[in-house]
Amino acid sequence: MTSLAELRKNYSLGSLDVGDVDRNPFRQFDTWFKQAVDAQLPEPNTMTLATVDPRGRPSARIVLIKGVDERGFVFFTNYESRKGRELAANPYASLLFYWIELERQVRVEGRIVKTSAEESDGYFASRPLGSRIGAWASNQSQVIESRSQLETREREFSLLYGDQPPRPPHWGGYRLVPEAIEFWQGRPSRLHDRLLYTRSDEHSDWQISRLSP
């Protein structure tokens, strides 16, 4: 069996200093995200979403970011899924973007709010037809008997709605409103650069602190 203790990589592609970054973390994120896209990284819009259930037990999964602006980070999902139920019980979450080819991470923490129905409708209408039908066919996170059961539901909803399926009432968007955003740049000898943006409320200026790696 491979010895996991021997797997290691020394990071040396870049550095990160307070004088190098934008004072606004959303603009800084946009800069890094564009660099990830320009570097042609595979699916740079993927992120890990961590939630916590009422008993304090965490869960995590990969989801896709679908919007970022001064209000926060937006993603869409089934409100009745495990993550949806956990966010209803505890409306706080953490996101992690990991761009290993650039030796970078971005960690975002904050409270969760639902997007407006208009935002959810607009994004849902932009999805491929198969994905829109799939939102009806899948009772996300629920146990099913077989793959064929899922495919039967897909056919049934396809016949029912044709090429104009409406947005399911149990499907829509969330916005994570950040309270903290950390930018991480890998450095040699595990002495990485970590810059943390925080603010006391949504109307305050962002403060930047350097964290020990």
Swiss-Prot record:
Top-level lineage group: Bacteria
Binding site residues for substrate: R8, K9, N10, Y11, K66, Y123, R127, S131, R190, L191, H192
Cofactor binding annotation: Binds 1 FMN per subunit.
UniProt cross-references to Pfam families, sorted A to Z: PNP_phzG_C, PNPOx_N
SUPFAM superfamilies according to UniProt: FMN-binding split barrel
GO molecular function: FMN binding; pyridoxamine phosphate oxidase activity
BP GO terms, sorted: pyridoxine biosynthetic process
EC number assigned by the record: 1.4.3.5
Pathway(s): Cofactor metabolism; pyridoxal 5'-phosphate salvage; pyridoxal 5'-phosphate from pyridoxamine 5'-phosphate: step 1/1; Cofactor metabolism; pyridoxal 5'-phosphate salvage; pyridoxal 5'-phosphate from pyridoxine 5'-phosphate: step 1/1
PANTHER family with a match to the protein in the record: PYRIDOXINE-5'-PHOSPHATE OXIDASE, PYRIDOXINE-5-PHOSPHATE OXIDASE
Protein name: Pyridoxine/pyridoxamine 5'-phosphate oxidase
Gene (name only): pdxH
